[in-house]
Amino acid sequence: MYYPKAKQTLMSLAVASACAAFIPAHAQEVASTPGAAATTDPAAQEATTPSSPAGIQTVTVTGLRASLESSMALKRNAQGFVDGIVAEDIGKFPDTNLAESLQRISGVSIDRSIGEGSKVTVRGVGPDFNLVLLNGRQMPTSILGDRPGRAYDFANIASEGISQLQVYKSARAETPTGGIGATINVITARPLSRPGLQATIGIKGVHDTSAENLPADVKRGGKVTPEVSGLYSNTSADGRFGIALSGSYQERNLGYNVASVGNGWKGPFRGDENNWGTIAQPGTPGSENITNRPKPTDLYQVPQNMNYAMNGIQRQRTNGQLTLQYAPSKALTTTLDYTYSQNKIQTRRQDLSAWFNFGPSSSTWTDGPVAAPLVYTEIINPANSDIAMGGADFATRTENNSLGFNAAWKVNSDIRLELDAHRSTAESKPDSPFGSSNTLGTASFSRGTTSVDFSQDLPVLSIQGADFQRAPQQVNGSVFENAYVKSEISQVQTHGSWKMMEASELKFGLATTDAKNRSAFSVQQRDDTWGGATKASDYPASYFHQESLRQYFDNIDGHDNPNLFNTFYTFDFAALRQLAAQVTGKPELYMPKSGYTTDQRTREKSKSLYLQFNTDWDFAMPVHTSVGARYETTEVTSTALVPIASSYTWVSQNEFAVGLGTPAFTTLTGKYHHWLPSFDADIDLRSDMKGRFSYGETIGRARYDQLTGGQVLETLGRIEGGRGSQGNPGLLPVKSKNIDLAWEWYYNKSSFVSVGHFRKSLENYAGVSQVTAQPFGLRTPVGGAYWNAAIGAGCASSDTMCIRNYIFRNFAGRPGVTRGPDDVNGNATGSIAGQPNDPIANFLITSYSNQKAARLRGLEFNVQHMFGTSGFGLQANYTKVDSGLGYNNASIGEQFALVGMSDSANLVGIFENDKWNVRAAYNWRDKFLASTFDGAGANPQYVEAYGQLDLSIGYNVNKNISVQFEGINLTDEIRRLHGRNERQALYVEQSGPRYMLSARYKF
């Protein structure tokens, strides 16, 4: 039988010093415990000594190579499976965006938003199941324009004030719950960790080429935008008092242009199916216009619309942190810190779109079993449908505040205690009088036969008969939305350690967490102008500016297709909105509502405790083990104010408005608890070689939109009915049983090779279910008395314009029928409301339940090699992830498949000497499933493989001054999403490279 040996190792020194409660600040300081706000440095070459003024003794190293060496030391000396990125120097992180840095780590992939990293996926597990900590504290998140979730948006944090990023991939009892893929700890500066004066200031000019390729009505700001950052840290009173202050302000102008089938593809249909939206069956009129018809058992879908949007963005990001530390004795250190960030985004958009009404058509198809149209044409004659052109102008502001206090007490040589408390908030809200989102729609009613060619990367829209002189643009609809999201976390954590022997340690802790999330919104929708209630003569031609479409997609295959409908008109949103408000005489309807009609609130109160026992063993080879368990209980309360729907009204050819009445509150609750065991072991196979094993259980809580009670109906419906959603606060967290294995060879000071294998067995995934319901008993005119009269008079059921004209011309003034003026093509406009004896409208309601399980496995390969003293170095990694739960494109209906799972690879080359440093980084992510629902229902969305090349070149003028050039996305890559077939385009985005030139002064 073996017993622990009283042997002091580098690991045990690091574990002991972890309880000294000092967060490392800079490039050479690497922390080891994500659950504690104060952590220490297992990578440091010199161990902590009790006589250190702040409990830490460090050696300052800087530069690219030093950053890689420190990251390697973190990986080598950590308990469990840990990777990280360490700052090159005070105030200098390898990437300008933290998510972009994280993607250099094996197993980590990122989602991009407005041209930069936003959210992370780790080992095939999506952003909502990766926990982000700031100095060991759980952080709230708020994002407008997305479903309320738990995914942290790294775009809110500037990298200049960050010391290191730690990615904990294996489970430990002391780690807070929520990170199934990983727990990511963002470490900022602490003054007592680095005694003396430390200061730096930097300026940067940013030129984003994407901001140039925009229409004049969308462009914002100048070609070059400024950034400034600074960091000051100092200690006094013999190292007992310290202050650190960091701040940054950054502006950025950018753009991105998108071609999309924004409302998804209708279907899927079987080749032999005959329904609204299907292609003509053999032997029926129109069947002769179909080439390579889908076989009877093939699946196919047809596009619902085609849209081109040009988006201009301005962003101002402000970050700041103040840290005060006081150590009244060598045994006690207190820390008070305040962190603030603000991210302001202004958006302008102009778009061109065409809707399909599933009338007579012609089409050419790919082969099955999942067929897609190469060309889809809807025959429209005469040319009097709408060519839609819209605009938007809105702004949002996100603010994050965190106030925290930490006290670390070394009771004696064996016992250390720590108390950490913080209150943090994240709040997103409108920052414009026009709301957080809006659309002002215009149209020319001169659209004839309309086609889309999907054979190239860019879907190519063609329109016959367009005549902007005969049918000038006119306002035909508007939507103004005010949305608000606030997340708040109040957390108290206690940590302790008892060094029982020199080679054994017991860790323990308690925590309470109170998390609140609020999501509220209101929609002001102008329905009675969608069909053109106002007339074109109300809007002078001078308000509209002619543009050429193809120039804004010049980097996408297909932009030079001569059939592309190239002419569209833009406008000044504010001016046209003001004119439309005057023309209609109802200006209040062209502004967002002042209050919220939907207000959903969720509160989670959690309590936890843990025990963890760490031991060094002296077998034939040194072994370190850690055994622990964590218990956690959570209570969930969801209160929702939702509007009560009161009517279902036909307001234009293919759109129905859901009328909303007085909102009402409902409250639902849920509760759960978990025991989460963990075990880590590593063995020194040789002095330069390690083997690792880990088993642990982790949980990840459901997104807030899945938990929130209250049934919410979308305000726009279609002929076939509407849509809605409803949460379930009784959802259990996803639980994962995790196994990790690794072999690591550190064959010199700066180089290593590692191979890892991981498995995750997940249960309680929230499956999405859709049921057809008839909420509130809303009546629809479809199939009612007026509708049937039009059918009886000879209108085809698919010819909705014929049906509307008949109803308006024969039943105007009757109950529910309000006729407006005819449009320029002689078609009647107005609204037709459902009547008491009409059919009840069907709604497809989406909800959630614990019903799914999944398994995934993967391999990680890492190599880092420095070529002696030449200054050259190489870093490469590849991650392979696999699961049996892929999406079956040939299957109809709801499916459960793991989203976000993909292979990924990184290749980084560096060169560094006393004067120059060069870094070229290529990141690649394979195709992955992003969602199992699109705008039309249960259909997949695939993000195609994407690779990006970034470059930085730095020059040290002297020991104080350095300059740097950076290039992002140098090869000008595009992003593309598709559906069941690669030709079934959903989204194609063109942005552009970004260039930066900076100077930095270090005091």
Residue ranges and their predicted role:
Residues 761, 766-773, 777-933, 971, ...:
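Gram-negative outer-membrane beta-barrel transporters
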Residues 139-169, 220-223:
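Short acidic/polar hinge/loop motifs at secondary-structure boundaries
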Residues 58-93, 119, 127, 137, ...:
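N-terminal periplasmic "start-of-domain" segments of outer-membrane beta-barrel proteins
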Residues 155-202, 256, 877:
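A beta-strand signature from Gram-negative outer-membrane beta-barrel systems
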Residues 761-764, 923-933, 954-1003:
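C-terminal beta-signal and adjacent terminal beta-strands/loops
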Residues 188, 205-206, 221-235, 248-250, ...:
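Outer-membrane beta-barrel transmembrane strands
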Residues 2-4, 776, 780-783, 788-791, ...:
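C-terminal beta-signal and terminal closure region of outer-membrane beta-barrel proteins
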Residues 99-141, 169:
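Extracytoplasmic beta-strand/coil segments of soluble accessory domains associated
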